[in-house]
């Protein structure tokens, strides 16, 4: 028995070490799903010097290492044709060309899925529970296979968006009128259909189950989800700090470390943002949170949600539903990166490691330590010196 306990402890320690190793490869990302609609509306993006720059290239120049792209089933049935498979492919191609990794966020809806709405796609309205599982699997495979066919293999895939109450209502709603496995059965079945579909196409991809309220103690959710058969490789959290941002930042970072420890999987902050009305304060808030997230063992990275929004732009469907403009964009009114994105530039340690191996190293590196072309623009290290082009 003693040998068994020792073996189990060593195994759990190894698993945690693997999960915590993600900190050495801390992901700095952004969900930029609105960019194509913004561009169609005439919006353009500029670097710090005011030069117009393609958004994905600009994200890379800033220091981002990844982008997150949401997928809707048939958005034309809701409020517009953006974020369908074709739109996602177009954005993924651009991200891939810019050297960014990709996270795919399946909403399994024709519009936003979140704790307040997990609306079934119109085309699936009459499906039975079994047909819904097949639809989830089919939709997941279709999008991922299309990406893979173009040489784009997402590193992470979300099966559902902010699914604290479940997904694809009513069949996938967590039924709190029941207890135990019966309450979770519908949600677990649909989530697992997505998980299995991801693995069938991309065996190495990390599958994320994502919920909101990062500062809250969320262990109960994942404890029950796992207990009743739910599968996941990574935990995703949303974190939108408000006036008590220092305390909320600390809580979310602590929760990320706690969840990574309890479930032996890495935790990703897949959404964050702060009000853009005070750019300097937003920069301070994000710097504080990034420092705390990086220090949290098991926290794999942070994605800013729709930082490219500026000038109180809003998508056309916001007018149809009567919503105000998104107020957490991280670009200035001139379309340039604002201070909130300074924290996503990285610390330069990989650059130093890459260029310090040899005094004769004449390669050019970006601020993530990745080889860059001699014609690359932005903040770079070449011949052991930092340059701005």
Please state what every model-predicted region is.
Residues 40, 44, 176, 277-288, ...:
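Aromatic-rich peripheral "rim/lid" segments of glycoside hydrolase catalytic domains that contact
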């Amino acid at each position: 028995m003693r040998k068994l306990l020792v073996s189990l402890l060593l195994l759990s320690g190894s698993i945690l070490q693997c999960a915590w190793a993600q900190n050495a490869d801390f992901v700095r990302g952004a969900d930029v799903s609105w960019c194509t609609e913004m561009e169609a509306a005439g919006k353009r993006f500029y670097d710090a010097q005011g030069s117009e720059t393609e958004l994905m290239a600009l994200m890379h120049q800033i220091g981002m290492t990844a982008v997150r792209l949401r997928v809707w089933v048939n958005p034309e049935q809701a409020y517009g044709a953006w974020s369908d498979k074709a739109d996602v492919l177009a954005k993924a191609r651009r991200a891939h060309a810019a050297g960014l990794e990709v996270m795919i966020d399946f909403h399994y809806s024709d519009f936003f899925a979140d704790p307040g709405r997990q609306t079934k796609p119109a085309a699936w309205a009459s499906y039975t529970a079994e047909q819904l599982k097949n639809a989830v699997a089919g939709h997941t495979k279709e999008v991922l296979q299309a990406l893979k066919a173009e040489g784009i293999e997402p590193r992470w895939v979300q099966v559902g968006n902010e699914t604290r109450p479940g997904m694809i209502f009513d069949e996938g709603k967590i039924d709190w009128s029941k207890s135990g496995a019966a309450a979770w059965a519908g949600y677990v079945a649909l989530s697992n259909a997505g998980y299995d579909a991801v693995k069938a196409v991309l065996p190495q991809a990390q599958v994320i189950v994502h919920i909101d309220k990062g500062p809250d103690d969320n262990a109960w959710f994942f404890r029950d989800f796992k207990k009743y058969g739910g599968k996941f490789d990574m935990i995703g959290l949303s974190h939108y700090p408000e006036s008590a941002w220092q305390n909320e930042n600390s809580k979310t970072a602590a929760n990320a470390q706690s969840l990574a420890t309890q479930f032996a999987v890495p935790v990703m902050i897949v959404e964050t943002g702060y009000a853009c009305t005070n750019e300097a304060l937003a920069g301070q808030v994000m710097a504080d949170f990034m420092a705390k997230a990086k220090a949290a063992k098991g926290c794999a990275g942070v994605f800013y949600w729709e930082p490219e929004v500026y000038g109180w732009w809003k998508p056309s469907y916001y007018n149809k539903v009567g919503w105000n403009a998104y107020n957490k964009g991280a670009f200035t009114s001139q379309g340039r990166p604002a201070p909130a994105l300074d924290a996503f530039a990285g610390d330069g340690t990989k650059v130093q490691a890459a260029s310090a191996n040899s005094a004769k190293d004449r390669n050019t590196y970006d601020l993530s330590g990745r080889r860059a072309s001699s014609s690359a623009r932005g903040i770079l290290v070449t011949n052991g010196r930092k340059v701005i082009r």
